[in-house]
Amino acid sequence: STNPNVTVGSRGAYASGQAPIESPSAQNGFMIFDSDYYDNYGVAGGFGTGPYPSNPSGHVGTLTTESIDLSNYSAVSLVFNSYYREYTGIAKVAFSTDGGVTFADEMEVHPDIDVNDATTADYEVMLNLPPNVAGQPSVHIQFFYDGTVLYNSYYGYYFWMIDDIRLIETPANLFVCQDEMFGGWWKGYQTTGDLGCNYTFNPMAQALGNPYRLEGVVRNLGANAQNNVTLHGEIA
């Protein structure tokens, strides 16, 4: 059993009431670094009064694996469920190939999450291990919550929950499309007098002269290099 139990997420004053992570095996336990609670003990305005305060000088939390033999694998990916809300604390992963003495090749887990934003509770992360880490006979992986970044006079906050950590062989070909968006004039927007909202109807003549923008970020998570990648958009 755990205290608190697996039905409780963050207990911090500014993140309390958040549900726990919705990973496949959350009912048998998960890891949480509750930066909010550790700083204020669940009391609004109680900055620096918690059991492991982040204010006034910051705090750090780490979770490190035992040694893992990856000598037979040239391309490896780290996959896990992550529920993360950010104020100034940053979720990171680092790797060691010298028995856990030093950790390098640091990777930010959620670089797309801004201040006061959060992932979904069932978010799944996939990170490709650096080439100099895959293939090594002794690898330690460290999950690292960095609450030493100062923002708006405060350190840390809010929380990071992880569960169902596993290593897989990186698929040869795997694309992920993110940050998809459409709408808005990208040509002649200063003279059309139209906001280009995605619910707007326009005559074809105007649409041809002032086309919509369709864009996204395509990430290659596969082991193979990909060339001449083209993003297609379909309007129905």
Spans of model-derived segments:
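Extracellular carbohydrate recognition and processing domains
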Residues: T102-G135
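Surface-exposed, low-complexity/disordered Ser/Thr/Gly/Pro/Asn-rich loops and linkers
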Residues: T2-N72, F159-M161
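Extracellular acidic, Ser/Thr/Pro-rich low-complexity tracts
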Residues: S23, Y84-E86, V218-N224
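Extracellular/luminal regions of secreted and cell-surface proteins that mediate adhesion/ECM remodeling
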Residues: Y158-A236
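Extracellular carbohydrate recognition
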Residues: N55-T62, G147-T170
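Extracellular and analogous surface-interaction loops
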Residues: L63-V76, N128-V133, F201-L208
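Extracellular beta-strand-rich recognition modules
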Residues: L63-T65, L70-R85, A91, F95, ...
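Short acidic/proline- and small/hydrophobic-mixed sequence motifs that coincide with surface turns
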Residues: T88, F103, N224-N228
